[in-house]
């Protein structure tokens, strides 16, 4: 949602999410050129102040290295101020390979590329039932007719729990949480050349401040 391209250090060791994050990060520069969307490899900092913060950052950095993430560096207050003058902190972990992307342009570029390669879109087409056939294909019932397919990819966002239920994979529920974005004027853009995060907790990455490819904060 924020348009941040992560470095792969924040995810559990050996997880699929970590693997795909590191691989996707490496691909992003070439992909941006090929599909013509905005991407800036500007880096990212996780800012800390306490001894506990430092220990957490060290663990985070080691986890990142185990995941294959590269160019991770612990920096002192002076170096942090040089990178992001508007941020106050005693130290930080600097992820050189992190960056930002225009999430709207990126999504549209992927959709256009998929369409050019034969993908068909059916908008306003709600899935109401899915039945697995004896030949291991699926009959998908929608508000605009039925479809038969060999594969079903569940990417229904907030509705993915309902799709899972239709496939007999029960027990997954999406617990929604509301987030607010405050967009500042482009005059503030020079104050923040890269995304800034607090030291992560066990539950989430925290509230961030980030620059955008359009020059806002």
Language model segments and positions:
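Short, well-ordered beta-strand micro-motif
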Residues: 46-48, 141, 183
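Glycine-rich phosphate/pyrophosphate-binding beta-alpha loops
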Residues: 10, 98-100, 204
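Helical element adjacent to the flavin cofactor pocket in flavoenzyme catalytic cores
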Residues: 93-151
